Every structure is written in structure tokens, then in C-alpha cells.
Amino acid sequence: MNATKFLVLLVIGVLCAIVTARQVKDLSTETKLGASLPKTTTKGIGAQLSATGSTFSSSSVVSYANGFNNPKGPGANAFESGSTFTSGQVTAKGRKARVSSASASTATGEAAAAVTRKAAAARAKGKVASASRVKGSSEKKKKDRKGKKD
């Protein structure tokens, strides 16, 4: 490559760089972030007041008992299984937002089987209980004596 070609390519590169480098306009913070704050907000804090909560509770129990008498003799079997599941979610925004969530569940079961030489007996019972509670509150800004907001 000779010096003339190099100089021409260098000038073209500089011109392209100048053309593509435009002055960036000053944008508002709202435009840059892609979000807009309502005019009613005070410094953007405490504008949205909300308190939400959810909770879920589930219980299950399986009790099984079997007694039988066949030609080979009496027999019995029993099975018991219980399971519980609880979950909760809490979201609080704004000034003095409070949320409490609680859930509880229990599962109990009983299974029994008895066998004698001439007879078989079986018994099964199960009990489940679930409870859930959610409380939430949020306070708005109060006006002071002069009529100004906090």
C-alpha cells in the first residue's frame, strides 16, 4: 500500500468518524429511565402505598388397614401416611406499610391391624387441620397543623 492510498483511507475514516459522532441531546431522567413519576409524588418517595399478603396451607393424610382370613390363615396389614405444606408471600411498599402472614397445618393418622388364629381385625383413622391468616395495612401521609404534607 503506498502513502497516497493510506492518506486517502485515513481521511475517509476521519470524516466517517466525524459524521457519526453527533452531539447527544440532554434527556430528562424520566426519559432515560423509561419511567415517569406522577406529579403528586413528593420527591418520588411514599407515592404508592400498598400492603399485600397471601398464605396457603394444605394437609393430607392416608390411613389404611386391612384384615383378612384365607385358607392359609388370618392376616392383616396397615399403612398410615401424613403430609403438610405451608407457604406465604408478603409485599409491602410505601410509608408504614405492614403485613403479617401466618399459616399452619397438621396431619395425623393411625392404622392398626390385629390377627388371631381364627380372625383378623383392622382399624384406620386420620385427621387433618389447616389454618391461614393475613393482615395488612398502609398509612397515607397526614397533614400537619399548617396544612403542609410531611
UniProtKB/Swiss-Prot annotation:
Residues 1-21 form the signal peptide. Keywords: Signal. It comes from the Eukaryota. Coiled coil: none annotated. One of its GO terms (biological process) is mucilage biosynthetic process. Residues 119-135 have a biased composition (Low complexity). Residues 119-150 are annotated as: Disordered. One of its GO terms (cellular component) is apoplast. Belongs to the UPF0540 family. This is UPF0540 protein At1g62080. It comes from Arabidopsis thaliana.
